[in-house]
Design a protein with these regions (language model features):
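Post-cleavage N-terminal segment of exported redox proteins
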Residues: 2-4
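Local sequence-structure signature of Cys/Sec-based thiol-disulfide redox active-site neighborhoods
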Residues: 6-46
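Short beta->alpha junction loops/turns
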Residues: 27, 50-53, 78
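Generic recognition of short, well-ordered alpha-helical segments
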Residues: 32-36, 59, 84
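Thioredoxin-like thiol-disulfide oxidoreductase module
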Residues: 50-68, 94-105
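Non-catalytic, surface beta->alpha helical segment in thiol-disulfide oxidoreductase systems
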Residues: 75-105
C-alpha cells in the first residue's frame, strides 16, 4: 500500500535487490509479522526454519552474536535484528533503502 501511495505521489518505490535472510520457527507471531512485511514489500527472502534444522539454529546464534529470539533478519549479510527492528526501519523509511542496495556476491 505504501508503495502505491508513493507511486501516486510521484515517488517510485525502489526495486528490491538485496539479499534477505530470515531465521524463523513455525507458529511464531513475530516471525509471521516480519515475513508479512517483507512479502508486502515484494521481497524474496531465504527462510531458515530453526525448529526443523539444527544447523540453521547453530548458525543463527553464531551470526547474531548469541541472540536466540526470533525472527532474526539479515539484509546483505548485515544483521538487522528481529521484527521490532525491522518495523522500526520501515517506519523510519530506512528499510526501502537497505532493500534497494545491490548485494555483491
Amino acid at each position: 500500500m505504501l508503495d502505491f501511495v508513493k507511486l501516486m505521489m510521484g515517488q517510485d518505490p525502489k526495486p528490491v535487490r538485496a539479499l534477505v535472510e530470515i531465521y524463523t520457527k513455525q507458529a511464531s507471531s513475530a516471525c509471521i509479522r516480519a515475513k508479512w512485511l517483507l512479502c508486502h514489500k515484494g521481497v524474496k527472502y531465504t527462510e531458515y526454519r530453526i525448529d526443523q534444522d539444527e544447523l540453521a539454529a547453530i548458525t543463527m546464534v553464531d551470526r547474531t552474536g548469541g541472540r536466540r529470539d526470533l525472527p532474526q533478519i539479515f539484509i546483505n549479510n548485515q544483521h538487522i535484528g528481529g521484527d521490532s527492528e525491522l518495523d522500526r526501519l520501515n517506519r523510519e523509511g530506512e528499510l526501502d533503502h537497505l532493500l534497494a542496495e545491490v548485494y555483491n556476491y
